[in-house]
Curated annotation (Swiss-Prot):
InterPro entries: AMPK_C, KA1/Ssp2_C, Kinase-like_dom_sf, Prot_kinase_dom, Protein_kinase_ATP_BS, Ser/Thr_kinase_AS, SNF1_UBA. Its EC number is 2.7.11.1. Residues 1-45, 399-424, 466-486 are annotated as: Disordered. It comes from the Eukaryota. This is Carbon catabolite-derepressing protein kinase. It is an enzyme of class 2 (transferase). The gene is SNF1. It holds the Pfam family UBA_2.
């Protein structure tokens, strides 16, 4: 494992970084220290320690919890600890899904993606041990201004290769921005927050985070369309390339609505000093209509992009492997058994044999079960990781050590839940790794898989091509069925003017005695509702929550066609802290029962709202 040297920074630079990060969470920080990593005395400050990691400082806070800088007691290697609060996850009913997705993300091994080394679980927290990078591309641009095209292209090639790698394995970032692009000591890009902070949860068609005027969301994100797909990453990568080449943002306005209008209209200028090739690529990426936007694979075929392209960044030739037999690699199987908890004979080998039989018969592997497809995806991903490492070792690059995907630091946490610690050190919590995963049948279905695009016309064309040619990379395609003209949507559709639709919803909510939060400027088409529901029939304890929360959101399906979506958002007590008089165990039991006893309260209130809307439309 190559040790990572930390950059030196002046007080002014540190202050700039502090000001810049006040609304972000990251896995890096500039340190005033020598470049040599010195192991920490095992007896030092045991209270501020998690396992064999000594916590040094807090780097920031995210939506799930805090991010801390830590150092391994034995090796002195610095890592970032992303500490996720289980209670926060439980409120959104995401814990099982997050654990499953984290275990999948542990398999991601690309030279230009921040690596998830390990996952530690305690009773109250899930702790992710993450690769630590000390610099940020944003600061590099601020200090140097616009870059020469050769330098910008080198960074851009690394970014696109990492994005392509994740898209190929059904993960989309959706939050690419300079702050998420870190640099190691060899000035190689490391993309942070790939996957975890952008988990596509059921019921959330779109999850935006516009915390800064510098954030450049894609036009389809701003318009609030029913959409979440890889085209968003292409737009963001185009913005990043523009910033590197021009030293400024393509769209800039201190007034957020004016900024979003410029983005939606695609209003930007290209400096004359840019080469024709750079201009051509930017104009293909910064396209308002995602249907016409260049794809990641088309970017990788662009002449300007391909100049001086290192071989290790080239994706594998999938066309050669489309109908080829899958080899059984014992090293990969062994690693997959440890990482994901799959049984060798009953699970992994069996799935590979079934897939090979289907290939031999000319059938698609999509006919396998969802859990089998998941195992096959994980096996192929890890097999590609092994091949990537072999290719990198053959490379003649001078900075090969910084390219190699590092292994996790030596973990003191055995797979079966026991925790070792330094002699004389008493730990307040017992941690276990996530290496042994429960049976797949006990966990929610993973939502990490995505379609190549959610856009209707492209999706229809893609599915038609898949049906004709077959595509093992899209493991989750359903078997061919008779084409139906019926179009299904979750929610109710309307062709009325959007503001009229929202007005009718507010009027119906008022008539039914519901409450709602005042919407922010960024969420004009979202209503957060609180509705009293009678729980007295189910619970004798007065501490049981009786306010059901619902989120109502308006989406645009196509021109002049809109969708109203209803989503259950949990429970809340009408008595505030009045329930604290009852024992904690009783309150938790009530909460558990309310959260699991039935879906009918939500369906009942949603039905009442839909009926009220129908009555209002008839009377109007």
């Amino acid at each position: 494992m190559s040790e990572q040297a930390q950059p030196q920074a002046s007080a002014d630079q540190q202050q700039h970084q502090h000001n810049h990060h006040h609304h972000h969470h990251h896995h890096h920080h500039n340190e005033n220290q020598s470049q040599q990593q010195v192991p920490i005395d095992p007896a030092a400050n045991p209270a501020n320690r998690i396992g064999r990691y000594q916590i040094l400082k807090t780097l920031g806070e995210g939506s799930f919890g805090k991010v801390k800088l830590a150092q391994h007691l034995g090796t002195g290697q610095k890592v970032a600890l992303k500490i996720i609060n289980r209670k926060t996850l439980a409120k959104s009913d995401m814990q099982g899904r997050v654990e499953r997705e984290i275990s999948y993300l542990r398999l991601l091994r690309h030279p230009h993606i921040i690596k998830l080394y390990d996952v530690i679980k305690s009773k109250d927290e899930i702790i992710m041990v993450i690769e630590f990078a000390g610099k940020e591309l944003f600061d590099y641009i601020v200090q140097r201004g616009k870059m020469p095209e050769d330098e910008a292209r080198r960074f851009f090639q690394q970014i696109i290769a990492a994005v392509e790698y994740c898209h190929r394995h059904k993960i989309v970032h959706r939050d690419l921005k300079p702050e998420n692009l870190l640099l190691d000591d060899q000035l190689n890009v490391k993309i942070a927050d790939f996957g975890l902070s952008n988990i596509m949860t059921d019921g959330n068609f779109l999850k935006t985070s516009c915390g800064s005027p510098n954030y450049m969301p894609a036009p389809e994100v701003i318009s609030g369309k029913l959409y979440a797909g890889p085209e968003v990453d292409v737009w963001s990568a185009g913005v990043i390339l523009y910033v590197m080449l021009c030293g400024r943002l393509p769209f800039d306005d201190e007034f957020i609505p004016a900024l979003f209008k410029k983005i939606s209209n695609g209003v930007y200028t290209l400096p004359n000093y840019l080469s024709a090739g750079a201009k051509h690529l930017l104009t293909r990426m910064l396209v308002v209509n995602p249907l016409n936007r260049i794809t990641i694979h088309e970017i990788m075929e662009d002449d300007w992009f391909k100049q001086d392209m290192p071989d290790y960044l080239l994706p594998p030739d999938l066309s050669k492997n489309k109908n080829s037999k899958i080899d059984v690699d014992e090293d990969v199987i062994r690693a997959l058994s440890v990482t994901m908890g799959y049984d060798r004979d009953c699970k992994i080998v069996n799935v590979i044999e079934k897939a090979n039989k289907q290939v031999a018969a000319g059938n698609s592997s999509s006919q396998q079960s969802k859990s089998s497809n998941e195992i096959l995806d994980a096996y192929l991903l890890m097999k590609e990781n092994h091949a990537l490492v072999k290719d990198l070792k053959k490379s003649k690059s001078e900075n090969i050590e910084s390219f190699l995907s590092q292994s996790p630091p030596p973990s003191p946490f055995p797979n079966r839940g026991s925790t070792s610690s330094a002699p004389g050190v008493q730990q307040s919590l017992t941690y276990q790794t996530l290496a042994t995963v429960p049976d797949l049948s006990t966990l929610p279905n993973s939502t990490i898989a995505i379609l190549p695009t959610s856009l209707p016309s492209i999706h229809r064309a893609y599915m038609a091509e898949t049906k004709q040619n077959g595509d093992p990379s899209q493991q989750h395609a359903p078997p061919p069925t008779k084409k139906s003209k019926t179009r299904w949507h979750f929610g109710i559709r309307s062709r009325s003017y959007p503001l009229d639709v929202m007005g009718e919803i507010y009027r119906a909510l008022k008539n039914l005695g519901a409450e709602w939060a005042k919407p922010t400027e960024e969420e004009l088409w979202t209503i957060r509702v609180r509705w009293k529901y009678d729980t007295s029939a189910q619970f004798e304890c007065g501490s049981a929550p009786n306010l059901m929360k619902m989120q109502i959101q308006l989406f645009q399906l196509e021109p002049n066609n809109y969708l109203v979506s209803f989503k259950f958002s949990g429970w809340e007590s009408a008595h505030g802290n009045a329930g604290t008089d009852s024992p904690q165990s009783h309150r938790q039991q009530d909460l558990d029962e309310v959260g699991s006893f039935s879906a009918y309260p939500f369906l009942h209130l949603a039905t009442r709202l839909i009926m009220e809307l129908a009555v209002n439309s008839q009377s109007g």
